[in-house]
Amino acid sequence: MSFPATSPSLSSYNQLQSLDIPDAARRYRRFSNVSDAVSRKLSTTLGWRTVSIQEVVTQAKSLCGQHIRAWLKRRGLFTRKLGLQRLRSVASLPGGLAVCDVFVQLEGLSLELERKHPKLYSGVCRQMGVAVVTEKTIAKNLSSMAHNIFKKDITWFKVASFYNLVSAAAVDCVRQGHPEYLYGLVEAAGLVIERDVANWIANQGGWVSEQEGQNQ
């Protein structure tokens, strides 16, 4: 699996960039509300378990925080001063211990990808062409790369790869003296999941289905 090292200019993403933030947020909420309504109707009719988009996104952000924490610890960069304690524990979120199990599976996929493609997840800011590291520029480039990753199809390996990119960017931020950007990266990852992946995850049955679909 190989993804572009640079962040291309994508017309659909540029259109999103042209929207002001409140307008974009309203559109995201409207799409999410419609999706939730359809899911509830199908659940009532067919007996499917309803997994809300908000539940998926909330858990995605917590998983992202845990993922970043694990990457920093493996590189000897994690301290309590980094601010990740602001994130709620995975165990306290809807899904509880099951989501903790999801994190173990997610880490397994992430480590496998990192072993196979070490250069892809090293110096991510440089690969994205970010000359001046700011929270906004990193979030913008991650969003563009994510759009390119998920535009054709979505798999759990691609989700794990996106998390690797976010965590690699977090490593770059800490090494360049900007640990205060980490929480913003988690928020940016949450927006990407909501925009590109949340509906797919919900249709799979939520994050817990990752344990069954990790070989996709």
What residue ranges belong to the model's regions?
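Amphipathic alpha-helical interface segments within eukaryotic helical scaffold
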Residues: L106-D172
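Alpha-helical bundle/repeat cores within regulatory domains of eukaryotic proteins
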Residues: S143-Q216
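Terminal intrinsically disordered, low-complexity, charge-rich regions
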Residues: M1-A131, N199-Q216
